[in-house]
Amino acid sequence: MNRLKFFLLLFCVSVFLSNCASNEKIEDNKENTFEVLTYSAELSETITLDNSEIVLGKSREFKYWTKNYQNPQNNIAHIKTSAEFKNKKKIFSGSSNYINLIQPIYFEGNLCHVKKKGFLVCKKVEGKEEIINIDIKNDDIEKYEVVRGGITYFDNTIIFVDAYGQIKSIDVDNSKINWETQIDFPILSAPLIYRDQVFFISADNRIFSLSFKTGEIQWSFQTIEESKKNLFTASPVAIENIIIAPFSNGEIIAFKVDDGQPVWSENTSKISIISNFNLRDITANPVISGNSIFSLSSNGRLISNSIINGARNWNVDISGSQTPIISANQIYLIDNEARVICINKSTGEIYWIRELEKHRRGTDSKNLNLWTGPYLINEYLYLISYFGDILTISPFNGEILDEDK
């Protein structure tokens, strides 16, 4: 049995819960009607593009998943697995009356997650033997109402951060705390371990760098604080000696890993009188592919920038909260209007658009059919809805191939 089978399903559900929570303020728009090929006045397929040019990158099987979106570039691309969305088995039990925004992690056959009562629990996937069960919540609380922050693994160590400003290093072998550090603001992003440093973003729009070995703060940088933000924030990405952080005011800023010196900055939000009253947060993780970084804001644009100097390659007026998937020369994403979009990575032109069901019945918020994904698995795109539907879509033309309700 493929060990990733259980984890893949749990991962998708975890990201799905994050998607539901990130859209707590919703305004209904009853005038969203779309014509063929032009689904809005601002977004349309590029007629000159040929869908036959779409070629998927080589799929690969992941043996571990030690952070949210697997790697420091947040680029999971094309997944190869024998897992199926059938015969699902429960590894962890829990309740549905709370929100858990922390994605589980998988390493060396172990699956770890944070429970409502503030316990970090790790189990062997095969056999379900419990290897870690420790209380990591703040001493002043009984349980989490909303589980925010994140966990990541490296070198026999789990790093945990939460919305109470806690940062803890936990030894996997003996479940003991190596060190712990406290900051004054909630931590809303999952941590990133990179080059012996721990990076995360706090609610006051500050990126921190801590020593992986001691927990000592190496450097920090604060940009303009934003009062309107989602329940969670996207995580930093890194490549070579560059760490790039997405902030809740729509900014992305590149820093030198060693000393935190800013290198370049960009703003993904559309600036206008109207947009100043809306969320400009970035909840979709930026993705690094090749020499470019691709950033999607909750109320703004999808932007491609050079990693080296931040020069803008192109931008498209698309808003979304789900991390894009990049395979070969295509970007796949779902926007806030429940449209699955395939974009040319080099130019920002649109190959195809597939509109999904935005509301199940009525147009009020309780009937809003939030979608998570897409995930490119075994040459198919998969999306999961708020109501538990699983869609299978062709990555070549956007055709809906299967709908499991």
Give residue ranges: language-model regions.
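C-terminal motif of bacterial Sec signal peptides marking the signal peptidase cleavage site
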Residues: 16-19
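Blade/loop signatures of beta-propeller domains
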Residues: 29-45, 51-88
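Structural signature of WD-repeat beta-propellers
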Residues: 108, 115-116, 155, 162-163, ...
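Extracytoplasmic beta-rich repeat domains
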Residues: 85-105, 129-152, 178-195, 217-240, ...
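Short loop/turn segments that connect beta-strands within beta-propeller blades
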Residues: 124-128, 171-175, 211-215, 256-260, ...
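Bacterial signal peptide processing site
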Residues: 21-24
